[in-house]
Swiss-Prot record:
Gene3D superfamilies: Vaccinia Virus protein VP39. One of its GO terms (molecular function) is 23S rRNA (guanine(1835)-N(2))-methyltransferase activity. It catalyses: guanosine(1835) in 23S rRNA + S-adenosyl-L-methionine = N(2)-methylguanosine(1835) in 23S rRNA + S-adenosyl-L-homocysteine + H(+). It comes from the Bacteria. This is Ribosomal RNA large subunit methyltransferase G. Its main location: cytoplasm. GO terms for cellular component: cytoplasm. It comes from Vibrio atlanticus (strain LGP32).
């Protein structure tokens, strides 16, 4: 796996986060190289204030912070931590970190953005740029050619201004736009809906998975959250909008519930949904984190988990494996991990390897999903 980005007589050492010994994926892509080359050809005067949005692991921030004042804005805790590590690794100049719910700073001279995965997040970011940037400030986006559609360009035109694209290079394309003087399109941050068959109403911020309806996996999982008066602490790992936590809180009002996600918008959505559905009297925590980094061993009784199978734009199963390992670490003896996943992902095999085959059972399955339960045995359990 390549860890050195060499371009225009400069070299940066870049790693993904978390740093794994058997990593097979790079911390940058051809889109980063394309946009770096283009901006360097612009011959900007040193000291420009550059806003970099959705920088996966800090390659763009590390590059441009050498000569410019850089603000990095991302919804991803993983991206923030990865960028910080890479900035330190390359002894880069200081970068200001923001999440995508923060206000866009004044005095931006140029915006560089990796286009987000969902149109709803793109609409949000462009609408925020439109309100904050001076007319004519250039915005340069980049993405794979196959992911830039006519609808993508229409969103730029509608929410920002006149838009054009570059030629394709290494399967990537640049998008050029700037704010115009037309009336601003107002975008509400939340969408709301009721969950059919449940006494639950949900709000989702723009970058939260399954933005305008409950995804099938979460709906299936709702039916299998345990009700146990002995439960004292529940962790919702990869909480998304917090729907599992809301249901768990309804069933187990005595329990302390901790919502964890790497998306700042997901954590804030969970906070809002628990407040709206359960009130403010309960004992709840909301943490943006890399899985369960920093959590104490043997500190909880139940972990609920609906793992993602992508990190940034890459398809990968290492996040699920890290979630399972972290869950085992924090579970008390006899504590349980309940997982939902697509059947083809083979989570049963992974859990059996980690917890022991005798301690993994299938709670429910249908043609698409399976719900698995793994029980933590005492430390002297012989595998």
């Amino acid at each position: 796996m390549k860890t050195e980005l060499t371009l225009l007589d400069r070299t940066l050492t870049l790693h993904r986060f978390p740093n794994r010994s058997n990593e097979t994926l790079q911390a940058w892509d051809a889109g980063d190289e394309y946009i770096i080359s283009h901006v360097e050809e612009m011959n900007l005067e040193p000291g420009k204030h550059i806003l970099i949005m959705n920088d996966s692991f800090g390659a763009l921030s590390a590059w441009f912070s050498k000569d410019h004042d850089v603000t990095m804005m991302s919804d991803s805790f993983i991206s923030h931590r990865g960028a910080l590590k890479n900035l330190q690794r390359n002894q880069s100049n200081r970068v200001n970190f923001l999440n995508t719910m923060d206000d866009i700073p004044h005095g931006i001279d140029l915006v560089i953005m990796q286009l987000p995965k969902t149109n709803r997040h793109l609409v949000w970011q462009l609408s925020q740029l439109r309100q904050a940037l001076p007319e004519g400030c250039q915005v340069i986006g980049v993405n794979k050619v196959k992911d830039i559609h006519t609808s993508t360009l229409n969103i730029f035109e509608k929410y920002l201004g006149e838009t054009k694209t570059s030629l394709a290079k290494k399967k990537h394309r640049l998008v050029f736009s700037s704010p115009n003087c037309q009336p601003i399109q107002t975008v509400e941050p939340f969408v709301e809906w009721d969950v059919d068959g449940e006494d639950i109403r949900l709000k989702n911020l723009p970058n939260v998975y399954s933005g305008e309806a409950l995804d099938q996996g979460a709906r299936y999982m709702l039916e299998h959250i345990p009700q146990d008066p002995e439960l004292r602490h529940i962790i919702d790992l990869g909480c998304g909008n917090g729907v599992l936590s809301v249901k768990a809180g309804q069933l187990n009002p005595q329990a302390r519930i901790t919502c964890v996600d790497e998306s700042f918008m997901a954590v804030e959505s969970a906070r809002q949904n628990i407040k709206d559905n359960l009130g403010e009297e309960g004992n709840f925590q909301f943490i943006a984190n890399n899985c369960l980094d920093g959590f104490k061993k043997n500190s909880t009784y139940l972990v609920m988990c609906n793992p993602p199978f992508h990190q940034q734009q890459a398809i990968t199963d290492h996040i699920a494996w890290q979630m399972f390992c972290d869950a085992k670490h924090v579970l008390s003896n006899g504590g349980k991990l309940i997982v939902i996943g697509n059947r083809h992902l083979g989570y049963d095999v992974k859990l059996a390897r980690l917890f022991g085959e005798a301690n993994v059972e299938t709670l429910e399955l249908n043609q698409k999903f399976e719900i698995l339960q793994a029980t933590r045995e005492p430390a002297n359990f012989n595998k």
